[in-house]
Amino acid sequence: MAGYKPVAIQTYPVLGEKITQDTLYWNNYKTPVQIKEFGAVSKVDFSPQLPYNYAVTASSRIHIYGRYSQEPVKTFSRFKDTAYCATFRQDGQLLVAGSEDGVVQLFDINGRAPLRQFEGHTKAVHTVDFTADNYHVVSGADDYTVKLWDIPNSKEILTFKEHSDYVRCGCASKLNPDLFVTGSYDHTVKIFDARTNKNVLCVEHGQPVESVLLFPSGGLLVSAGGRYVKVWDMLKGGQLLVSLKNHHKTVTCLCLSSSGQRLLSGSLDRKVKVYSTTSYKVVHSFDYAASILSLALSHQDETIVVGMTNGILSVKHRKSEAKKTSLPRRRRPAYRTFIKGKNYLKQRDDIMVSRPAKKHLEGYDKDLKSFRVSQALDRVLEPKCVIRTPEVTVSIIKELTRRGVLANALAGRDEKEVTRVLNFLIRNLSQPRFAPVLINAAEIIIDIYLPVIGQSSVVDKKFIVLQELVEKEIDYQRELLETLGMMDMLFATMTRNDSDPVPEHVPAELPEEKTESPTQPSDTDKNS
């Protein structure tokens, strides 16, 4: 009796992504560490100085985390309401933050109580930053104003009322202590100069501005709002260089890599995009579990921290280079081990005993071997198999079709099982590699369950989706055939023109030959 032959699973070539230096660089992070905060993480900021701690603003607290710690090393909770935008000074010794009650507070990293409190805004302060000289603070609030504060005197220096809506983002120049940028929900980004008491440049973003970023050189400005990330040339009067639209939802945060060669953007679509600052093309992408509100990179891009709307803080650390350790050398086998049995001579009375190799059968092969066709189909319709290895499911359907028992395997199913089969068909019917097998399966399942259509709303919806998918595929095929017809006509025209060239030596017009009609008499005959 012949043994059972396992089902041959057809393999298909997999087109992998192109491996680039950016892919290797940005994939070189460990598994993320997740920290639960008390509320949505609105801001993450790294200290520019060692030991590169980072401040996390969530709810009414500001937590200071060590670079590799999962517990806060310090907490600032002197806020009556929600805290916003905790930002380090360049020396890493002071921290400034806004709040929902309109008060800007200045903290010493080594203390707990605020060193300064700047009161002047009437509504929530969503953006604060230190100027380049480290002696002034810029703040923007929902009262449409931008204020400049003096740290030593705790006084307000200037107030700008240039915006007509909430001021939700801003940053100060790292080179010029008098320049700072603000973005507002009035769709504008304004650059202010403390020496002129007014904005010196205004660009129209076109959407409510959620984040702004000034390059370290001060020559380029990046604004984010809506689905757009726009780059402006400051040296050319705010000329738009490029408009990027790679996110599906609102872009909420921006960040630069340590080298300044890569721009990162986070969005509510749960993705972080990495752009090249030379070509402005996406070179890498990160996926997260929830919508992203804040993003920060540490020194040398060693750590990437992302804050999300569900209060989860995701921390990724770069993998350290594994040190090569010298293992103890194993003792090599003796020479006689290798030549053992080579000099043995077979005898006439020797009996050869062969042990049959035991074949390992998959679960679906065991079911098919026992003619349990329905169980075999159920096994390959499990979500794990359908998502990871759909070719296995298609191979089993093909084997059932070859045996002529596919209708038996599909019949007698309840609403949940029929829905699972229809979901697989909807997911893979339009793929060219699976279409020949699945079209036959779709016809069989329609024939079986056509009499009971209308008894289950869930199954009816799946059949409608399947019908729309087939109609859309037919439209695609019709358009492709029309395109092929157009191309054939063009190729035929080109071939005909190339095959009948006009010779260059043939004159355009041939001279007419003078011939006399045989019926007309000549002049000599007339004279005679």
UniProtKB/Swiss-Prot annotation:
WD repeat boundaries on the chain: 36-75, 78-117, 120-159, 162-202, 204-242, 246-285, 287-326
Superkingdom in the source lineage: Eukaryota
SMART domains for the chain: WD40
Residues covered by region (Disordered): 496-528
Bias (Basic and acidic residues) ranges: 497-516
Protein localization: Nucleus, Nucleolus
Keywords: Acetylation, Isopeptide bond, Nucleus, Repeat, Ribosome biogenesis, rRNA processing, Transcription, Transcription regulation, Ubl conjugation, WD repeat
PTM-bearing positions, type N-acetylalanine: A2
Main localization, broad class: nucleus
One term under GO cellular component: small-subunit processome
Keyword check for Magnesium: no
One GO term of the biological process aspect: rRNA processing
Placement of covalent cross-link Glycyl lysine isopeptide (Lys-Gly) (interchain with G-Cter in SUMO2): K249
InterPro entries per the UniProt record, alphabetical: G-protein_beta_WD-40_rep, U3_snoRNA-assocProt_15_C, WD40/YVTN_repeat-like_dom_sf, WD40_repeat_CS, WD40_repeat_dom_sf, WD40_rpt
Self-association and partners: Part of the small subunit (SSU) processome, composed of more than 70 proteins and the RNA chaperone small nucleolar RNA (snoRNA) U3. May be a component of the proposed t-UTP subcomplex of the ribosomal small subunit (SSU) processome containing at least UTP4, WDR43, HEATR1, UTP15, WDR75. Interacts directly with UTP4 and WDR43.
Functional description taken from the UniProt entry: Ribosome biogenesis factor. Involved in nucleolar processing of pre-18S ribosomal RNA. Required for optimal pre-ribosomal RNA transcription by RNA polymerase I. Part of the small subunit (SSU) processome, first precursor of the small eukaryotic ribosomal subunit. During the assembly of the SSU processome in the nucleolus, many ribosome biogenesis factors, an RNA chaperone and ribosomal proteins associate with the nascent pre-rRNA and work in concert to generate RNA folding, modifications, rearrangements and cleavage as well as targeted degradation of pre-ribosomal RNA by the RNA exosome.
Protein name: U3 small nucleolar RNA-associated protein 15 homolog
Source organism (scientific name): Mus musculus
Encoding gene, per UniProt annotation: Utp15
